[in-house]
């Protein structure tokens, strides 16, 4: 018996010892020394400043201990994960198989040193600020199956060497700056199951080699610039479950082979053309079907309502007609807005569901007692008109008791009061949290209609407002702490308005992309803005317009109200990033809205009441003196007011809400226009520095009494400047029209003019980054004048003295005294020449032909002066060089183009940016106007978004040397600067452009409504 017990004891001892040894081996397994050293190199390339590998083995902690910089902002979305296989060398050695460093704002490059982790299977580096491209060295990693580098600053072409990544099953490069065509070699990655190329700058047609990718299950190629039709070979991807093509650039029709894909769960296609008939989709398991703004016509096929798994159906902004009925189990989200659907929707059963349903902009009929559901959007859904066109009978009061002339809304926020020099303005609250995917909320004189859900965020509880706790700068920061947003379409409409002309101000600030998280700067929110059904802003990007996040930008437009309603629509056309700072962040966003009748100068200002006690005047003689004095005062005041009212009528005629300063205010601000405060001479007269009582520093332009311009030109300048708000235009605060004085009040620019910064005796030391920023800023300002403002405008005198610099060296264009409205129907205006020799385009100076291309020429000269630090008005280079531009052309031919770069930079400049700026300057100063780019194209060239067209030298009569010489002759021998041109204005009609708008937010349904109403009323 004892032998048996002893045997059992020995057996259990051996088993226990074995288990202890295994545990000991596992506990002492550690990362291979080579890979430990490799991590240090990888961290350096990624831009990690300090990496702690001493305290704990990475495979044990399953993370990298990174010591962040001081300004690092903690982020709950950070994913810092290391995956290891510790089965090597009898479970004592670990090898890294997975590396995830996501949402960390790393600023380095993709590390080729990852090849020193030979067992690596997965690379995840999303949401950083990494630059460069995908290293071809990674192809050596035999086990690599997944590359995810979304939301970075990677650029260039996708490398053709991708074919060497033979085992790759997932490639995700969404949200970068990749450009060029997709390489044919991508079709060799036949193991791919996931391919995400969205939100880049890819161009060209999709190569036919992609037909080989038969294992693909999900594809995202949205928000690119592809060309051609949707390829039929997508039908080869028989395992495909998710296909997202919105705003890709591809056009219809949808090939039959694609329609027959049976495993499709999600099909998203939007904002394109060529898809006229509804596809007969084979997949019965569809969960998401988006065919938005693609040109569909005819009725909605009945099989759609029988797809039991369908959760999201978006058929908005097409030409679908017919009746919607027989719907038993509708999808959770249905968007039918902007079609021609008709019938009595109340009898169809659709409204009895719990779905979110958008019926806006259709031709449905409603009873007078129609019920408004909290999840049903009925705005503009009926052809039954009432006194407020387009709203269902139950949606508005029978009659407007009072007509309003102004409205202020704090979008997404509480009631806010702001103060300006005239008094207090109150912005109404818009903080209702009842907004949903298909809602129409209505208040006393306005309403807001919302369409769409953020499908990418995988959440059933979307929020349609946002806010920030950060301290904001700029004027009236309280207006920008909140904002309302939408996933597709956001409409603000005002009703019971007095008819007439209105000034509409739209306030924007990007508060969802924070500069504190570096990767968030890469976010691009792009949407379109329509006012009264007309496209006002296409591809509007708040960040780009404001030159950064958390900066305000105001867009103004003049609109006409004829039916007591005004409508503002913001629409997402599928462009921009959708995954920064996280999935589901896209679509329009707006902070505040203000609209004011042109004959309402106070625009809702609440006047402060002053109570004045008048002393009792005793005695008849005292009363008589008082009466006489009053009579004289009234007479004098009448003369003054008559003159002042005339000027104010001129201002009102232009629909302005300019702040009027008193003479006493400006006299006090400038210390009685003390010469010590004189800044210089402007286009009309002297300019003085001043300080208002609230501490605001201003620049006051005192118009010369000898100026030939006078009141009309004064009003003209106010008319053009006051309606323009842009970060790169000098802001006009207001004016003064007292005591026969005409004064303009501008923001004060601390660093004076660009001319002084470049050529002055005490010139600023502008480094290359400042010069690049200044040049791009000028370009953006001109782009706005030409194409971004409500009225297109030619400046006519762009030069370095008319570019001012603020404290942060932001460039702002000044002196619009020479500007002329550029009517959209005129190709050129021949008028008196007014400008500066050395900056004027040849066709303008010699023949008086004025187009935007004259400003483009002047900008090219200024750009060359910025890069060179030299003035174009002085001879440069050798004796054969007539001008700075001519010298640059000579250097380009000899291959010494960088010799023109300012030596003050001492070689410290970005060579590629310098070459780009020089080439842009040269193409802008082409002697032929037709060969110059537009300012919009020039901006994209400067930012590297498009190629720079080759400069064509012209030895003929328009040649640069001949033109400059002739201009100097004119400057010497002519004082009138008219070049023999009369001041008669001659016009030539502009040729029409392609008529089809891809984003018809007023589709035929709305046009037909208007036509029917107008025709019936004329009978």
Swiss-Prot record:
Topology Cytoplasmic: residue spans: 637-1019
LRR repeat residues: 93-117, 118-141, 143-165, 166-189, 190-212, 214-236, 237-261, 263-283, 284-307, 308-330, 332-351, 352-374, 375-398
GO cellular component: plasma membrane
Subcellular localization: Cell membrane
Glycosylated residues (UniProt): 21, 79, 90, 153, 167, 188, 225, 236, 280, 306, 363, 387, 469, 558
Sequence ranges on the Extracellular membrane side: 20-615
Reactions mediated catalytically: L-seryl-[protein] + ATP = O-phospho-L-seryl-[protein] + ADP + H(+); L-threonyl-[protein] + ATP = O-phospho-L-threonyl-[protein] + ADP + H(+)
List of residues binding ATP: 679-687, 701
PANTHER family documented for this protein: LEUCINE-RICH REPEAT-CONTAINING PROTEIN DDB_G0281931-RELATED, PROTEIN KINASE DOMAIN-CONTAINING PROTEIN
Family indicated by similarity: Belongs to the protein kinase superfamily. Ser/Thr protein kinase family.
Protein name in the entry: Probable LRR receptor-like serine/threonine-protein kinase At1g29720
Annotated organism of origin: Arabidopsis thaliana
Gene: RFK1
